[in-house]
Amino acid sequence: MSAHFIGILAALGSAASWAVGTLLFKGIGEEFSPLAMTFIKSLLGLLLLAGVLGLAGWEPVKSFPLGWLALSGFLGISLGDSFFFAALRRLPAHRLVILMLLAPVVTLLMALCFLGERPAIIGWIGIGLVLGGVSLTFKEKIQADEAGDRRGPGLLFGVLSVLAMAGSVIIAKIGLQDVSAMEATFLRLSFGFAGMLVVGLVRAELGHWLAPLRQAGLRWRFLLAVIVVTFGGFWLSLYAIKRLDVSIANTLLATEPVFALPLAVIWLKEHPTATSIVGAGIALCGAGILAFNG
């Protein structure tokens, strides 16, 4: 089995894990602020990864990749995840994950500028389909009710999350050259956690952030979500980014809606409209073109 094919499987596995993780966090998100969710997720993820690396062994990391991974962690976790959780509290799960389809487009453009990747004409067609599908998904008029009032800020936080995460992926690609995906995941989480720790200390909110974990049922559900996104979401995504071109890896990560839409219907009893489903289908066609022809 080639490294390229394994990278593709890793990207698809990461997409599936993020779909499950998003729905798990959606179910408990009302109990935590976005900053609290990012802080606790990073803390628990670090403990899990430390245990695995303690058993598997740790290779020394040079200062060059360490600096890039530190910046990637702060941008993608401290900022990107906080924006993501803020959007998650304001948007239906299926709508948010379709918005996340913008990530491969933004990342591809950044890869074009900063990594020298050059997609073929068919790749630009894929970009158009992704943008068209996402636009179609948000074609419906937002009603001026309480839920609608929350969707405007939700869209803003979602876009900010896409920008932060796309930038962090480009930076991570540079730092991954001489570091294993598992160690890179640990380092990114470490620096992301450090950023959140500083925020919590400055705002004197650490106790408030951790308070909901006193509920045993909530604590175990949160831990399950963290296990899924740490090993399935974070680690597999970095493995894919290490093995594949950034544009291909991130486009495959955008297949998350394939898993999220049916899960949202079954699990959260949400009802995506026909327009959302068609938009997701068009966007995923574009994602497929980018993945296999970009």
Regions found by a protein language model. Give the residues of each.
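Hydrophobic/small/kink-forming positions within alpha-helical transmembrane segments
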Residues: A19, A50, F74-S78, P104-L109, ...
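Hydrophobic/aromatic residues within transmembrane alpha-helices
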Residues: I28, M37, K41, A87, ...
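Membrane-interface interhelical linkers
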Residues: M1-L12, A16-A36, I40-L71, D81-L91, ...
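Residues that define the loop-to-transmembrane-helix transition and helix capping
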Residues: L35, H94, A120, M182-E183, ...
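Alpha-helical transmembrane segments of compact multi-pass small-molecule transporters, enriched
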Residues: L44-L48, L99-C113, G128, S190-G195, ...
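Loop-to-transmembrane alpha-helix entry segments
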Residues: S63-G67, M100, A111-L136, E140, ...
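Hydrophobic residues within membrane-embedded alpha-helical segments of Major Facilitator Superfamily
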Residues: A10, S17, L24, L44, ...
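Hydrophobic core positions of alpha-helical segments in small-molecule transporters
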Residues: G13, I40-K41, S72, L99-L102, ...
